[in-house]
Amino acid sequence: MSLEDESFPADELFEQLNSASIGASRQFKSQFGEHDQPEAFERNPAPFLTSDCSDESSFIDAANKSAKTCVSDPVGLDQCEEEEEVDKDFEDSALANGNSELQIKSARSSKSVSYQDIHSAHTKRRYKHVTSKVAKYIADIHAQDQQRRNATKKFQRHSSMPEYLTPTARERGAHFSVDELHNLDESLDNSSAGNITDAKTPNDSYERLLSENERLQNDKEDLKSYSDYLQTKLDEKAMENMQLRRNFDVLRTDLTDCKEKLKRNQSYSLRSLNFCPPASVPKATQTDHELLSHAPNISRLSNMVAIADSGTPLPGSNTNNLTYDSSAGSIEVALLSVAPAARQPNAGKPKKNIQPHSLDFSNDSTEAEPNGNGTTSTGHSSSRAITSRRGAAPNNSESSHPSSNDSAIEVEALDLRSPYHRQPQGSIYPPMQDWGHSDGIYFFDKRNSRVIEVRSINVSQSSNPEQNSGTSETNLLNQSHVQFRHKRTSMGTRMLRLLGPCVRCTDTNQSVNASSATYTIGLPLLREEYGGRHTDR
């Protein structure tokens, strides 16, 4: 649809305009000339400027007038009818004067004046259903303003009101508002004093206030008691937490102590495994009785050395029957059951070879009593001098039983290297200066009848002394008939296996009482002779 079809009049109108005479141009100018002058707008001001904008009614009237001037607004039909009447009058006058060309020019130039003039009634009727955007915008503004006015009437401020002034509290009838109380006071002032009904009203209100105050006090006390209850619970929880922490600390301390005790017990058990007692323990030995009888006066080692020197078996005894477990016999002497292997000389370990000295057990050594107790003879055996030195006879390498000439004891100075060394079933005595003026600790093994000299560690000694004595220790381990639990041997077990097990000799000529007796033989070594040997070295 083109603009000419909708916005301009029909073709018959243009034909009528063309047929008009040209003389009507002057009249057209006289009619529309005033629109070209600015004073025309001042003489005819806009209708919405004449009213006061501050007035609400004037604003609404101006909006209604502007809505009527809209093109598509169906309300503005009056203005369109007026415009149509003006157009008809203009056409009639133009046809009468014959100024058709001037009328056409003036009609086309009227666009600049108002675009509303070119719309025909047909166009307005056709677009009557279209809603104007301007009118809709103005209507929305009116609706929002009306909604805002209605909201202010319904708004009630309850945030700053007391509780008894809220509508909910007033519905319960328990309180009166300030206005109601003021009205009651005024009514009391205006009423007479003798009116009973007026006198009851303030009394009732006062009672209500007192009851309300009492209720508030009760609520306050309840809240305080509940607060105290919560505080008590909190204190109990805090005490429980403190007790739990204290118990945890105690348990942790106990656990640490138990761990330390367990470590100590494990270390002690490992040390105890280093020593294993022999399978068979003799009932009584010569050394046991000697230590029991001479324990307070023991200060020398000469008695045990004399036993070793005079440890020859009795006449008529069979040397092949000397075993470790032999029960027959009258004397037990500490002898070597195996021959020590050849070892390299070591300057750090001085060796003392004590020559054997024959003993006569029947005459001058000991006499057996019928009750089994032995008495020591006080003869001249202690003053006997050893005039000759005789080397110890070599033992039989193929058999673990000693020969008849094997009566020498080899006493070595050993080093105590293990700091945790333990020596059960024995006694350790402090160093003794009487025997050859040598410093050392002597170990008396009661169970195996052994005498061992233990010396302190020599710093200047070779760092590997175990390599020198490895062969002899291996032979002793293989032939000593003592069971050990571990392959690794300590210094304590080595010292206990140096001299070998005890042996007993049998004598068929002795009686039962004499054979069952235990002898204590004391033949000390002469100091002069031993001192001479010590100085000769």
Curated annotation (Swiss-Prot):
Residues 371-383, 392-406 have a biased composition (Low complexity). GO terms for cellular component: nucleus. Signal peptide: none annotated. Residues 344-406 are annotated as: Disordered. It is found in: Nucleus. Coiled coil: none annotated. GO terms for biological process: cell division. Keywords: Cell cycle, Cell division, Developmental protein, Mitosis, Nucleus. Has a role in localizing bicoid mRNA at the anterior margin of the oocyte during oogenesis, and a poorly characterized role in nuclear divisions in early embryogenesis. May be constituted of a homo- or heterodimer. This is Protein swallow. It comes from Drosophila pseudoobscura pseudoobscura (Fruit fly). The gene is swa.
